[in-house]
Amino acid sequence: MSRPYDSMEPKVMDDDMLKVAVGEQGPQEEAGQLAKQEGILFKDVLALQLDFQNILRIDNLWQFENLRKLQLNNNIIERIEGLENLTHLVWLDLSFNNIEAIEGLDTLVNLEDLSLSHNRISKIDSLDPLVNLQVLSLGNNQINNMMNIIYLRRFPCLRTLSLSGNPVSEAEEYKVFIYAYLPDLVYLDFRRVDEQAREVAKMKHQYSIDELKHREALMQIRLEEEQAKQQKLAEHKMAFVEHLNGPFLFDSMYSDDVEGNKLSYLPGVGELLEAYKDKFVIICLNIFEYGLSQQEKRKIELDTFNECIQEAIQENQDQGKLKIAKFEEKHLLNLNAIREESDLFTMEQKLTECNESITELFNTLMILEMQLVEQLEETINVFERNITDLVGLFIENVQSLIAQCRDLENHHHEKLLEIAINTLEKILKGEMDEDLPDDVRALFVDKDTIVNAVGASHDIHLLKIDNREDELVTGVNSWCAHLVDKIHKDEIMRNRKRVKEINQFVDHMQSELDNLECGDIID
């Protein structure tokens, strides 16, 4: 797809280009001046227009984490990439580019409007995560297979579709097929779908659609089952006890244990293993249930903490708003009085009074903020102690339960070694009646060989138990450390933001007063 500006030098999407675009699209007049002085943070930008820039590659957008609308049409972009951090994006225009495949949209789960018209796309796919998609523009591409339409049935919110200008739109059954297979579509190729035509199309393809619905229903059931399974697994991971609600750990001990699996053929070992597994799984289930109960306690502790923090902040903000409201009421009266005052001495007195009021407000707001900082610091410290104690108790009790797993393994090892030695003695004496597989009998050449085999199996089992314990302890300790660290950092950022807000407000009041003073002196 050639366009007049394709011959121009491709541009790099760098910080300079982004800053210029943000500046041009930012607030104007007084708000714009303030924004230019302080700089606009990319994370605060909600809409970004980068059309007709001759951009070849999407890059450097990772800081626009709160972006809602992105316009990249009329460039020379060849691939959809670099958008993974724009998770809040709702509207995306990539029309009039050189894109050949739909890709790179997996994280844009909030996208509602997507335009990819006038590109080189030949297949509709890789849109599955866009569950909120309402408008899809794919006109003037190279889509030629009607089966692409069926793919779009998975988007329940899709109401507007454009495919005109594609080879598929030239097919005789084009509209009828779409009307039948996309029954919730309202607009096709910029025209409202005729309800009568939709009913005719539905009747024509009724049998095929019924079969398709049956297959989709089965797929939906499997999908929901898998989603429920994954949700449960995520909950178990949050409690650090995933895969402990069954024989998973026990089975993993034998999955890599070649010698242990051979030894299971020995007479009496089968019954021994069965009893061992039953007891081992019971302990794992105890760890699992205890882990879930402790996770609930940690959640309650965290929720209570967050409520306390928000209540304290809200109460402090309400006090600040009240102080500001009283100040503004008095300040406005003083400003009006100054404007109407003709006596210079009286004017200077009122200006001094205004300056003192501004200083007093600043001090009051800063005192309120310092009080809040102290209050939140105390609350955070109490929470840190509580959550650390909860985690410590959890680890202590889990380690006690895992020690029981080790005791079971040690007991099993002793019994297995006893059976193995007795079997060796029977084989050496020719008293072994049971047939053993050749690879198992090969272990019984002498005592050292069989003792080493039993010992190797035991070591593998202990290592699996140790690794699971380390995984749990490391996981919950890391979670606790990161949580506490984030809470402290969030409070520092909140304090800095609040102090900045106070200074900006006071500076604005002072600037307004200074401008008034200069104007009156000149007059």
Swiss-Prot record:
Keywords: Cell projection, Cilium, Coiled coil, Cytoplasm, Cytoskeleton, Flagellum, Leucine-rich repeat, Repeat. Signal peptide: none annotated. The keyword Cytoplasm applies. Its main location: cytoplasm. Pfam families: LRR_9. It is found in: Cytoplasm, Cytoskeleton, Cilium axoneme; Cell projection, Cilium; Cytoplasm, Cytoskeleton, Flagellum axoneme; Cell projection, Cilium, Flagellum. GO terms for cellular component: axoneme; cilium; sperm flagellum. Residues 369-393 form a coiled coil. Residues 166-204 form the LRRCT domain. The keyword Hydrolase does not apply. LRR repeats lie at residues 44-65, 66-87, 88-109, 110-131, 132-153. Component of the nexin-dynein regulatory complex (N-DRC). Interacts with DRC1. Interacts with TCTE1/DRC5. Interacts with DRC7. PANTHER family: DYNEIN REGULATORY COMPLEX SUBUNIT 3, PROTEIN PHOSPHATASE 1 REGULATORY SUBUNIT SDS22-RELATED. Belongs to the DRC3 family. Component of the nexin-dynein regulatory complex (N-DRC) a key regulator of ciliary/flagellar motility which maintains the alignment and integrity of the distal axoneme and regulates microtubule sliding in motile axonemes. This is Dynein regulatory complex subunit 3. It comes from Rattus norvegicus. The lineage of its organism: Eukaryota, Metazoa, Chordata, Craniata, Vertebrata.
